[in-house]
From Swiss-Prot:
PANTHER family: ARGININE--TRNA LIGASE, CYTOPLASMIC (PTHR11956:SF5), ARGINYL-TRNA SYNTHETASE (PTHR11956)
The protein, known as: Arginine--tRNA ligase
Keyword field contains Metal-binding: no
Taxonomic source organism: Streptococcus pneumoniae serotype 19F (strain G54)
A single cellular component GO annotation: cytoplasm
InterPro entries: Arg-tRNA-ligase, Arg-tRNA-synth_N, Arg-tRNA-synth_N_sf, ArgRS_core, DALR_anticod-bd, Rossmann-like_a/b/a_fold, tRNAsynth_Ia_anticodon-bd
UniProt GO MF annotations: arginine-tRNA ligase activity; ATP binding
Motif segment ('HIGH' region): 121-131
GO biological process, one term: arginyl-tRNA aminoacylation
Keyword line: Aminoacyl-tRNA synthetase, ATP-binding, Cytoplasm, Ligase, Nucleotide-binding, Protein biosynthesis
Pfam families, A to Z: Arg_tRNA_synt_N, DALR_1, tRNA-synt_1d
Localization: Cytoplasm
């Protein structure tokens, strides 16, 4: 139980009109620490109690069991709590030094499954910065949900089906060079894809030709299938190389093509339940009662199925296969309407578990304010970007620590971590402008800044030969250490907030605050000097390092021991 929960619990025992949860939401942190550590405003009770807030505050302060606190005083309409810093710091440091990386572990999920649909790049197209967001947000959410007791199933729903394969087949047959594709598959396929789209703008017959080749593919034409399989295999080799660089793993690569033989069953269920209506030759499900104006288009007039039919098949398969407690789709916010339709159709089909489906949208990555587009060839490719980030990180590491061993390995952890962290510190629904120089900076609110704070603490602990197992009683009550203690104590709540809001940026911002607070402490405190507080200061440094490393791990970012 953290301090705010303790206060809320104590107040709930003497306030009849508010429960603990409501009180917790009302608690504030005073701007001036002389006014206490936490304050409860009594305004909300004035109407019910029919008393002035000042009088209520005075009565509450007198009734509080102040043994848990240094003192409890009423100041105007506020009840101000002054915490026993020594006792709380001892308790927090003891918990972290004992539990280590398991500090803040919880069992909220009771080992139930969370399915995370993430990354999902299109086959035969390069892995760009645009795909990065879904990949790193999904990966971070997986770590966060595991931390609070869920098991996760990471699904890479590959874009390995659709009209674009018709376009690619036409382009390859017109202009493709087998040897060139074998040598540089994605580069060559991208050139072909950009060219066919550019030419199709002036020649509509290319579109029709592409549709025809896709129809052949759907009907199992041997040549079409062989080309499709080749494009898929070559793309996957490249994707897996990049996933290895990012240290992201998946439990399933079942993409769109996997559901080709599962969509008829969906159409049959919809038909049996009398949910299909005919509209201009197409089959649709009316969703007006859910406030959704446009019906869900299940089957086109030419008999072709659509994305939503495939996603319905995928949802049914995943529920049956994994019995999920939550099913999360980490997909751009431009798909919001699609996921509203998906949930509504599942609800119409009578599946209560449609409530367990959540679309986790995210904003766009731009470059100099402009939208990126594979089709137009305006794209930032991930592989050269990672290489450049690693190179920039190495230059800075060499300047700071020329004698450092394993520079290449550490530069890789810093460069990749910088890209991931910059993405994840951004509020998920906001976009951001891609700026590699800002990402890899060791100053400011960046991954390298947090990693460097961690490495600095490790250096201090090595010099002191600190062993948490042999440490004794800790007690700190100075202002700088108290700021750190409060953050560390808050870590479990931070993790819960990140999970509840599907928002890794909450963890990233916490990591920045903790690194900043420690750096401030380091600047004002001689940690290694012999003094009565030396062990406590080292324990505080150790606890900060444990929590920083764990926060970075939850973001999928490594924490090098030396930089």
């Amino acid at each position: 139980m953290n301090t705010k929960e303790l206060i809320a619990s104590e107040l709930a025992s003497i306030i009849d009109s508010l429960d603990q949860e409501a009180i917790l939401k009302l608690l504030e942190t005073p701007k001036n620490s002389e006014m206490g550590d936490i304050a409860f405003p009594a305004f909300s009770l004035a109407k019910v109690e029919r008393k002035a807030p000042q009088m209520i505050a005075t009565e509450l302060a007198e009734k509080m069991n102040s043994q848990a606190f240094e003192k409890v005083v009423a100041t105007g309409p506020y009840v101000n709590f002054f915490l026993d810093k020594s006792a709380i710091s001892a308790q927090v440091l003891q918990a972290v030094t004992t539990e280590k990386e398991h500090y803040a572990d919880q069992n909220i999920g009771k080992q139930e499954n969370v399915v995370i649909d993430m990354s999902s790049p299109n086959i035969a197209k390069p892995f760009s910065i645009g795909h990065l967001r879904s990949t790193v947000i999904g990966d971070s959410l997986s770590h966060i949900f595991q931390k609070i007791g869920y098991q996760t199933v990471k699904v890479n729903h590959l874009g390995d089906w659709g009209k674009q394969f018709g376009m690619l087949i036409v382009a390859y047959k017109k202009w493709g060079d087998e040897e060139a594709v074998k040598a540089h598959p994605i580069d060559e396929l991208l050139k072909l894809y950009v060219r066919i789209n550019a030419e199709a703008e002036n020649d509509p017959s290319l579109d029709e030709e592409a549709r025809e080749w896709f129809r052949k593919l759907e009907n199992g034409d041997e040549e079409a299938l062989a080309l499709w399989q080749w494009f898929r295999d070559e793309s996957l080799v490249e994707f897996n190389r990049l996933y290895n660089e990012l240290k992201v793993e998946f439990d399933s690569y079942n993409g769109e093509a996997f559901y080709n033989d599962k969509m008829d069953a969906v159409v049959d269920i919809l038909s049996e339940k009398g949910l299909l209506l005919e509209s201009e030759g197409a089959q649709v499900v009316n969703l007006e009662k859910y406030g959704i104006e446009h019906p869900a288009l299940i089957k086109k007039s030419d008999g072709a199925t659509l994305y939503i039919t495939r996603d319905l098949a995928a949802a049914l398969y995943r529920k049956n296969e994994y019995q999920f407690a939550k099913s999360i789709y980490v997909v751009g916010q431009e798909q919001s309407a699609h996921f509203k339709q998906l949930k509504a159709v599942l609800q119409e089909m009578g599946y209560d578990w449609s409530d367990d489906i959540t679309h986790v949208p995210f904003g766009l990555v731009t470059k100099e304010g402009k939208k990126l587009s594979t089709r137009k060839g305006n794209v930032i490719l991930l592989e050269p970007t990672v290489a450049e980030a690693v190179s920039r990180a190495k230059v800075q590491i060499e300047a700071k620590n020329p004698e450092l061993e394993n520079k290449d390995q550490i530069a890789h952890a810093v460069g990749v971590g910088a890209i991931k962290f910059y993405d994840l510190k951004t509020d998920r629904t906001n976009g951001y402008d891609f700026d590699l120089e800002a990402m890899v900076s060791f100053e400011g609110e960046t991954g390298p800044y947090v990693q460097y704070a961690y490495a600095r603490i490790q250096s201090i602990l090595r010099k002191a030969d600190f062993k948490p197992e042999t440490a004794g009683n800790y007690s700190l009550n100075d202002t700088e250490s108290w700021e750190i203690i409060k953050l560390i104590q808050d870590f479990p709540r931070i993790i819960n907030r990140a999970a509840d809001n599907f928002e890794p940026s909450i963890i990233a911002k916490f990591a920045i605050s903790l690194a900043q607070s420690f750096n401030k402490y380091y600047a004002h405190t001689r940690i290694l000097d012999e003094s009565p507080e030396r062990d406590s200061r080292l324990a505080l440094s150790y606890a900060t390092a444990v929590v920083l490393k764990e926060a970075l791990r939850l973001l999928g970012v490594e924490a090098p021991e030396k930089m």
